[in-house]
């Protein structure tokens, strides 16, 4: 009988920005939330969840586009994997005006999928997307408040969803490939003594042991690169048995 091994990889990698829709070389990038100059938009980008007054649940994903520009994707029913109907989206363009962060509906005219110019950016390939409506809103103090096309009010609060396995301890007899103290289990790579992260420096690294039957636990971080688009915002991954890639991207 072939024995099944349990492989736990506690890998916290800073992911390189590359691939399609690559960012310009001078696009600013942050790799720590503690950076002194990280823009306030990092606290605005994210997922929001709430209720339409007299209606159902609604979610939103707010995308920072650089500077004071944003786009909100409103999702009827809730967030992806947690209530969204999987079909309909409502796009709102956002920018700072008179000290507030205001959002208004877009009809899709002049828009293009993942365009670099925030005024032309669309998070959806189809413009306008299915279910698009004339919503409006404002973000303040972690809340997205606004009105639907028929005048109903809504309020969404910023939420941070986490995996139930985040921070999971390795099972008994698991092989820990990386825990922030040593890179001995890898051929190549660099251990950053300050951050305790395993860095690939843009090169492939491989495990010393050749493994083929396992369960993998991976933890990772993404850079913050709001001026970039598509995979340029953060793109990396790892290969299982040197063949099947698990790609890790900025989910927005």
Label each residue range with its predicted role.
Residues 1-9:
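Bacterial N-terminal signal peptides that target proteins for export
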Residues 8-17:
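Bacterial N-terminal signal peptides
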Residues 22-25, 79-252:
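Carbohydrate-interacting regions of secretory-pathway proteins
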Residues 52-96:
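N-terminal glycine/threonine-rich, aromatic-flanked beta-hairpin/loop signature
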């Amino acid at each position: 009988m072939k024995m099944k091994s349990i492989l736990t990889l506690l890998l916290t990698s800073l992911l390189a920005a590359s691939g399609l829709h690559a960012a310009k070389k001078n696009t600013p990038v942050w790799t720590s939330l503690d950076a002194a100059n990280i823009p306030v938009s990092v606290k605005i980008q994210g997922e929001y969840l709430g209720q339409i007054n007299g209606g159902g649940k609604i979610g939103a994903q707010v995308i920072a586009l650089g500077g004071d520009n944003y786009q909100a994707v409103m999702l009827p029913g809730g967030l992806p994997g947690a209530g969204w109907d999987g079909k309909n989206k409502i796009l709102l363009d956002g920018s700072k005006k008179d000290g507030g962060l205001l959002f208004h509906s877009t009809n899709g005219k002049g828009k293009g999928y993942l365009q670099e110019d925030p005024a032309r950016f669309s998070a959806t390939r189809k413009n306008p997307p299915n279910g698009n409506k004339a919503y409006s809103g404002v973000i303040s103090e972690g809340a997205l408040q606004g009105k639907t096309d028929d005048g109903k009010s809504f309020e969404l609060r910023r939420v941070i969803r986490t995996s139930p396995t985040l921070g999971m301890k390795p099972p008994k007899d698991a092989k820990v490939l990386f825990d922030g103290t040593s890179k001995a289990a890898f051929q190549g790579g660099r251990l950053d003594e300050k951050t305790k992260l395993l860095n690939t420096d843009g090169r492939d690294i491989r495990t010393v042991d050749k493994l083929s039957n396992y369960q993998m636990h991976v933890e990772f971080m993404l850079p913050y690169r709001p001026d970039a688009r598509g995979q340029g915002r953060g793109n990396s991954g790892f290969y299982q048995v040197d063949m099947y890639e698990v790609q890790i991207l900025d989910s927005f």
